[in-house]
Amino acid sequence: MVILIAVPYLLNRSVVGAAPVRAGQVITLGTFRYQPALGWQVDRGASQADLVSVLVKGATTYRLTPLGRQSSAAGAFRAAARRYAATGRGRVGGDPAAVTTARGLTGVVAPITGHTAAGTLTVLVAGGQGLAVSLTARHTAPLTAAIADDVVTMLDSVEVVAS
């Protein structure tokens, strides 16, 4: 009986579960790549090669999604905000503020609010391609300074892959 329960559970965890970020690991999403911070887990069930990268740490989720061809950060932001609202996880509000990463990528950032979580939506545009980065944490476990530092480091590591 134990085998009938344990084997499917272990197989499911090995295929769908979360995998710890490895030192030096780099994740590529279309024309973008970034280096996830140690201590986070790659959510293999929600992540899809070249489509979305989802990292989790406790009650915090860091999701990167390529937006395809975009002519401006403002247009890309509006599209990403609509997509986020359509998920039902919350909505993006407030006026977006300009942001520039350590590698010189530019974009905008605005707060995300919801019934169970809060965070930010950042959109970067480079080389005519857009990237949406959402960071959310459940209200029961707000962001810590260490997580905020990890997020800044990961956002600053985003770069355009040479084609």
For the regions a protein language model found, what residue spans apply to each?
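Glycine-rich phosphate/pyrophosphate-binding loop shared by adenosine-nucleotide-utilizing enzymes
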Residues: 133
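Generic alpha-helical secondary structure
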Residues: 73-81, 144, 151
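A short acidic, often aromatic-flanked loop/helix-cap motif at beta-alpha or helix-coil junctions
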Residues: 50, 73, 99-102
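N-terminal targeting sequences that direct proteins away from the cytosol to non-cytosolic compartments
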Residues: 1-60, 116, 128-129, 138-163
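Signature of long, low-cysteine stretches enriched in small and polar/charged residues
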Residues: 84-129, 152
